[in-house]
Amino acid sequence: MGASGHHAPDGSPVELYARLAAGDEPAIVHAAIPAGATVLDLGSGAGRIAHALIALGHPVVAVDNSPEMLEHVRGAEKVLADIRTLELHRRFDCVLLASNLLNCVDATTRAAMLAACARHVAADGCVVIQRLAPGRALTIEEGAWTRGQASFHLTSLIRRGRIFSATMVFELDGKRWRHSFEAELLDDEETDAALAHAGLRRDGFLDESRAWVKARVAV
């Protein structure tokens, strides 16, 4: 039942994310940007979102700090790099920062990632960010659910003010993976402040839960 294999630097199991189907993320991004818009996918992982965006007609540059993750990316230009220090000397119609990377507990890392978004987005482009939905994150509890063929079980939940840690247990095709993580909840004002520090401004939300934020270069 157990599964091992490679893990990304943040602990994400490579085999799992290479097999896990995308949810509604690609549709949310696609609806927020023009047809054929170029996308810089920061923290692309194994390409769950990138592959769907490519199929929808978007040229994608996939950036990740795990070579094992990037091995699974198909159809995109691939860049092995740390988001914080990324410098491609190019601009994109859309810069995507998904997977709740904004909720990292280190404020310096968060600022560096948003700065990377700002220096790679076109003047008339947008930054699309996925964060933990403020309302849901405050009430999250341990429990299990399914999505497609995969099952998820959130366990070992510990809250310390705005910061919480937990372990996610994934099961798919008879295999099981565990991923322990820590995250910091950000409300709208804190998100806006982080964006402003990077020279960005919020341009709206892309879903009812406010988990998806659209930002533009501040003028």
Annotate each predicted stretch with a short phrase.
Residues E190, A194-V219:
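C-terminal lobe and adjacent flexible extensions of AdoMet/dcAdoMet transferase-like proteins
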Residues A111-A123:
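A short glycine-rich, Lys/Arg-flanked "PGG" loop and its adjoining helix->strand segment in the class I
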Residues A107, V128-E190:
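SAM-dependent methyltransferase
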Residues A98-N100:
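Residues lining the SAM
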Residues E87-C94:
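A short acidic, Gly/Pro-enriched loop at the edge of an enzyme's catalytic core
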